[in-house]
């Protein structure tokens, strides 16, 4: 419920007004993060989906930057500390925070992989450098706008 409350606050204070005004909203985390983390904590995606669909609109596009768990472990090792819930320590897979992080993040990645098959998610390789993924994203967004609105994006944006 903590994740739902956090998402609701973010939606009310940052997202809903912009959507009502007809703006395009870009988020770095939204309902798919809540679904994946809820699944990793033992809840069923369909039950989570039923709950979140009542309160939050489904995004038109979502980018899933797929990162293997081991690569995520290496990135996390560079931080000064792992956050308790991000490491899944509340799940107590292991007393060792790194083992726990690995087990929890494996479940999160499994959830995202499952969601990517059934949702409007565009999968990008998070192992690639930003200068390679940025043009891919621009192309995908451009194709979406062309298809949905008959508009081309301005080059260079």
Residue ranges: model-predicted function:
Residues 28-29, 55-78:
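Conserved phosphate-donor/acceptor-positioning beta-strand/loop module used by diverse small-molecule
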Residues 6, 30, 67, 128-132:
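Short beta->alpha linker loops
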Residues 23-24, 61, 120:
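The start of beta-strands in P-loop NTPase/AAA+ ATPase cores
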Residues 73-157:
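NTP-dependent small-molecule kinase module
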Residues 1-57:
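ATP-dependent small-molecule kinase phosphotransfer cores
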């Amino acid at each position: 419920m903590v994740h739902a409350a956090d998402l609701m606050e973010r939606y009310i204070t940052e997202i809903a007004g912009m959507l009502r005004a007809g703006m395009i909203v870009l988020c770095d985390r939204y309902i798919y993060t809540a679904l994946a983390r809820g699944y990793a904590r033992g809840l069923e995606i369909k039950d989570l989906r039923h709950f979140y669909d009542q309160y939050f609109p489904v995004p038109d596009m979502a980018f899933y930057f797929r990162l293997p768990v081991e690569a995520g472990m290496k990135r996390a090792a560079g931080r000064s500390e792992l956050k308790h819930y991000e490491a899944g320590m509340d799940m107590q897979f292991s007393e060792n925070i790194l083992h726990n992080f690995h087990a929890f993040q494996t479940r999160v990645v499994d959830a995202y992989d499952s969601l990517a098959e059934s949702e409007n998610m565009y999968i990008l390789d998070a192992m690639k450098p930003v200068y390679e993924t940025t043009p891919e994203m621009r192309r995908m967004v451009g194709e979406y706008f062309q298809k949905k609105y008959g508009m081309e994006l301005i080059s260079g944006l």
